Amino acid sequence: MSTGETLDPHAGEGQARAPRILLYSDDVDARQEVLLAVGRRLTRGAPDIEWVEVASPAAVIAEASTGRYDLLVLDGEAAKTGGMGVSRQLKDEVYDCPPVLLLTGRPQDAWLASWSNADAVLSRPLDPEDVQRAVASLVATQALAG
């Protein structure tokens, strides 16, 4: 199995299923930036990523609680309830919470991001290669754990 692939119990033997990623930001431009950075697939020949975009903390919590996701990408700069607080809540309350990639506003926020229990943190400005690499790595880690 190559990096970033997970097996679908309903697919034929050896076929990879598309990774499912939940993307939270109240800013449509921030969500678009992540989508463009990661691209449609994690690796050449892999299935297209199944993205679910949400813009409210309640939607993140409801979706993450379903257990359907391989990765959660949370915007730490979202208004009212940022991704740091949401990450902390999910890690405390959701059984077998998937990995969390937290996007912060600046490198100096890394110390605060550690409180969130996120599995990885990237600071703005986002480097598309770093975003793609982090997403692929976290999805692969989740696939091995699952």
Language model feature labels by segment:
Residues 17-39, 72:
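Conserved acidic segment of CheY-like receiver
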Residues 33, 126-135:
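C-terminal output helix
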Residues 35, 70-91:
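Conserved phosphotransfer microenvironments
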Residues 53-71:
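Acidic, metal-coordinating helix/loop segments flanking the phosphotransfer/catalytic sites
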Residues 70, 94-99:
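His-Asp phosphorelay/catalytic-motif detector in bacterial-type signaling
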Residues 72, 121-122:
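Two-component signal transduction core modules
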Residues 105-121:
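Alpha4 helix (beta4-alpha4-beta5 surface) of REC/receiver domains from two-component response regulators
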Residues 136-146:
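The C-terminal output helix
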